[in-house]
């Protein structure tokens, strides 16, 4: 059975207060002066003090083979802050640190280890505050107002490096080859790792490591590094440094899912909801010039306009990509929302998903069998549900303690206001009719004979995304739905968590003393007219799921308060994020893909045209990470997702999967 949690570090603290691994019988850092050793070996060995001021790009990427207590990262972060203070006009503005850790410390052990270095306390406190739960895969932490990005990959580095997407090739400016000593942890120090380091290293990229072991030096040389010995720190005689001087040929392992970015830094986003708002922020942070075209007279008038939306992950025992994406998207969303400098109504009160019939009970039992971290999801027995949620349901279920609700409309409006302060230009009542290539740019034609020309375009306009010739064949569909707004009652006011059943019910929003209950589901419909049938069905589903609950029968929908919207969805419940694929060219180029995989060309796409769509009913959970993924792809920066899960987000995936099996593909 696939496990979705990571084992924490098994450690103790010695007499000097230094953490020691029980499994590897080795210290995490030197008893003498671990901080100075880090500065000497990794910062000095990679000549960062000299390279930072001369770096010709706005981003410097460093990768590390063992995160441990984070000493290397914290020391580097402090040094980077000092560099930026001394060189405010330097080209280099942001730091990206990628690290792998098989056995992450608990937050408590991390804080205890950090007490060793009071001079690093301001940086350590930020790291501890965002320390992720023990889930496999990549956890992106945005630190220091997003000037510093930390990608923590939890799992075995020799397994993870084979799961990295090709887009990470030749991105790393410097390697910190760290970890327990080769004699203590020989399984990590492999030729497989050395080869992966070479594949990821940028031409001219460097490496440094504390060891001078001969097999390490020879292995790195075989991988392509030019190696040399340097005086070791303190009592250690020697250490190793290296440079990637040659450019290695790097064939794409899965060209049909290849992602391409853009050399340009000017973009038009078509939208007006949560997707376009969060993407605007992510691109502005990377130095893009961003314009947003919204068809409505104000933002969040479409699917992002609800008063309350639930935040919790979508999990399934039988879909690894779904689990990997939504579990990491959920934890990223919580970190992102918690540090977002805008106000919006929300309450991280928890979400409880109830087994109201045999089918839903079986589904929950399967989720609970996946060895999920307790921080993510825990079982709740029927007799405990009332205590946790505040209302009696006579059902058992699964609770997401870090979930809750937020106001999507308010979030979208205020994020866009923040983005405007950072340079975003917004044009309201601009309905895009069509777009076409003109002189290496995109010509946008709007209703009313308005036109605009932009270097890059992102379509983030929800269910309207397939209305253009370039996107008309996308396998997405519309879902119309109605959310009912109901006044609270004395019993409903006791509801402390979001309830999910064959619908959902939120606790009251203190701002208006109303709850949200929903939502109806009409696949293929774009009708946004109020429906009395939907209003009654929202109430009836609640009563049907909890027939013994008197509070459910007291729900009042008679005032006809509701909101209707239309979502964009896919049959595999995953978003579509990336290049807009060229349908006709895909069918031509991949006509014989099943028999000729080795000869496959890169995925046919429209140049400088991207999409961010099909968020379905989980946009609040998926949008923050999707925005980060797309902004990173467009900017040719490291993407926080493994290759197979990233492929599951590719807009061409449903076509390519059929073509790989030699099956016919139909549009739409």
From Swiss-Prot:
UniProt-listed PANTHER family: SARCOSINE DEHYDROGENASE-RELATED, TRNA 5-METHYLAMINOMETHYL-2-THIOURIDINE BIOSYNTHESIS BIFUNCTIONAL PROTEIN MNMC
Cofactor requirements of the protein: FAD
Official protein name in the record: tRNA 5-methylaminomethyl-2-thiouridine biosynthesis bifunctional protein MnmC
Membership in a protein family: In the N-terminal section; belongs to the methyltransferase superfamily. tRNA (mnm(5)s(2)U34)-methyltransferase family. In the C-terminal section; belongs to the DAO family.
Listed InterPro entries: FAD-dep_OxRdtase, FAD/NAD-bd_sf, MnmC-like_methylTransf, SAM-dependent_MTases_sf, tRNA_MAMT_biosynth_bifunc_MnmC, tRNA_MNMC2, tRNA_S-uridine_synth_MnmC_C
Single GO MF annotation: tRNA (5-methylaminomethyl-2-thiouridylate)(34)-methyltransferase activity
Localization per record: Cytoplasm
The species this protein was found in: Shigella flexneri
Keyword list, A-Z: Cytoplasm, FAD, Flavoprotein, Methyltransferase, Multifunctional enzyme, Oxidoreductase, S-adenosyl-L-methionine, Transferase, tRNA processing
Coarse class of the protein's main subcellular location: cytoplasm
Segments for region (FAD-dependent cmnm(5)s(2)U34 oxidoreductase): 270-668
Enzyme Commission number, as recorded: 2.1.1.61, 1.5.-.-
GO cellular component, one term: cytoplasm
The UniProt record lists the keyword Coiled coil: no
Domain of life: Bacteria
Chain's role: Catalyzes the last two steps in the biosynthesis of 5-methylaminomethyl-2-thiouridine (mnm(5)s(2)U) at the wobble position (U34) in tRNA. Catalyzes the FAD-dependent demodification of cmnm(5)s(2)U34 to nm(5)s(2)U34, followed by the transfer of a methyl group from S-adenosyl-L-methionine to nm(5)s(2)U34, to form mnm(5)s(2)U34.
Region of interest (tRNA (mnm(5)s(2)U34)-methyltransferase), residue spans: 1-245
Reactions catalysed: 5-aminomethyl-2-thiouridine(34) in tRNA + S-adenosyl-L-methionine = 5-methylaminomethyl-2-thiouridine(34) in tRNA + S-adenosyl-L-homocysteine + H(+)
tRNA processing keyword on record: yes
GO biological process, one term: tRNA wobble uridine modification
């Amino acid at each position: 059975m696939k496990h979705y949690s990571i084992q924490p570090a098994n450690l103790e603290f010695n007499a000097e207060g230094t953490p020691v691994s029980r499994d590897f019988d080795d210290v995490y850092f030197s008893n003498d002066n671990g901080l100075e050793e880090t500065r000497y070996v990794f910062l000095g060995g990679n000549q960062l003090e000299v390279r930072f001021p001369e770096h010709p790009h706005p981003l410097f990427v460093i990768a590390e083979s063992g995160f441990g207590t984070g000493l290397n990262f914290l020391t580097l972060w402090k040094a980077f802050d000092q560099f930026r203070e001394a060189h405010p006009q330097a080209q280099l503005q942001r730091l990206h640190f990628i690290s792998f850790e098989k056995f992450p410390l608990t937050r408590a052990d991390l804080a205890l280890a950090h007490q060793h270095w009071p001079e690093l306390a301001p940086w350590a406190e930020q790291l501890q505050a965002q320390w992720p739960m023990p889930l496999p895969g990549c956890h992106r932490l945005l630190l220091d107002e997003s000037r510093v990005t930390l990608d923590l990959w939890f799992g075995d580095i020799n397994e993870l490096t084979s799961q990295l997407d090709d887009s990470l090739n030749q991105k790393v400016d410097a390697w910190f080859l760290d970890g327990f000593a080769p004699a203590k942890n020989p399984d990590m120090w492999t030729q497989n790792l050395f080869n992966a380091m070479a594949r990821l290293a940028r031409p001219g990229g460097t490496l440094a490591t504390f060891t001078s072991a001969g097999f390490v030096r020879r292995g790195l040389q075989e991988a392509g590094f030019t190696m040399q010995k340097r005086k070791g720190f303190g009592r250690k005689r020697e250490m190793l440094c290296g440079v990637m001087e040659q450019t290695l040929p790097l064939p794409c392992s899965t060209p049909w899912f290849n992602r391409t970015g853009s050399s340009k830094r000017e973009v038009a986003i078509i939208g007006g909801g949560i997707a376009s708002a969060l993407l605007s922020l992510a691109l502005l942070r990377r130095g893009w010039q961003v314009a947003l075209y919204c068809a409505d007279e104000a933002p969040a008038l479409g699917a992002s306009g609800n008063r309350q939306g639930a935040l919790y992950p979508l999990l399934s025992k039988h879909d690894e990509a779904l689990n990997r994406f939504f579990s990491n998207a959920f934890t990223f969303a919580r970190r992102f929302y918690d540090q977002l400098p805008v106000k919006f109504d929300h309450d991280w009160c928890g979400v409880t998903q109830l087994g109201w019939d045999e089918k839903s009970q079986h589904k929950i039992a399967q989720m609970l069998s996946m060895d999920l971290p307790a921080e993510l999801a825990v079982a709740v027995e029927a007799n405990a549900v009332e205590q946790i949620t505040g209302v009696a349901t006579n059902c058992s279920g699964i609770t997401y303690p870090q979930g809750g609700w937020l106001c999507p409309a308010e979030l979208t409006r205020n994020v866009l206001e923040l983005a405007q302060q950072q340079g975003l230009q917004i044009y309201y009542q601009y309905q895009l009719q069509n777009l076409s290539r003109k002189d290496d740019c995109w010509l946008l034609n709007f209703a009313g004979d308005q036109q605009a020309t932009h270097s890059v375009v992102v379509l983030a306009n929800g269910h309207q995304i397939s209305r253009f010739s370039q996107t008309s064949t996308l396998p997405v569909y519309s879902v119309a739905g109605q959310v009912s707004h109901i006044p609270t009652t004395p019993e409903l006011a006791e509801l402390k968590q979001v309830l999910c059943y064959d619908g959902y019910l939120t606790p009251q929003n203190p701002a208006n003393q109303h709850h949200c209950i929903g939502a109806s589901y009409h696949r293929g419909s774009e009708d946004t007219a109020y429906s009395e049938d939907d209003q009654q069905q929202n109430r009836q589903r609640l009563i049907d799921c909890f027939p013994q609950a008197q509070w459910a029968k007291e729900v009042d929908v008679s005032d006809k308060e509701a909101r209707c919207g239309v979502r964009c969805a896919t049959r595999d419940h995953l978003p579509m994020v990336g290049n807009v694929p060229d349908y006709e060219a895909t069918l031509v180029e991949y006509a014989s893909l099943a028999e000729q995989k080795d000869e496959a060309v890169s995925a046919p796409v429209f140049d400088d045209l991207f999409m961010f769509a099909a968020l379905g009913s989980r946009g609040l959970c998926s949008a923050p990470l999707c925005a980060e993924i797309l902004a990173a792809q467009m900017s040719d920066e490291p993407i926080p997702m493994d290759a197979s899960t990233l492929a599951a987000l590719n807009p061409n995936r449903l076509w390519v999967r059929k073509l790989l099996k030699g099956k016919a593909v139909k549009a739409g």
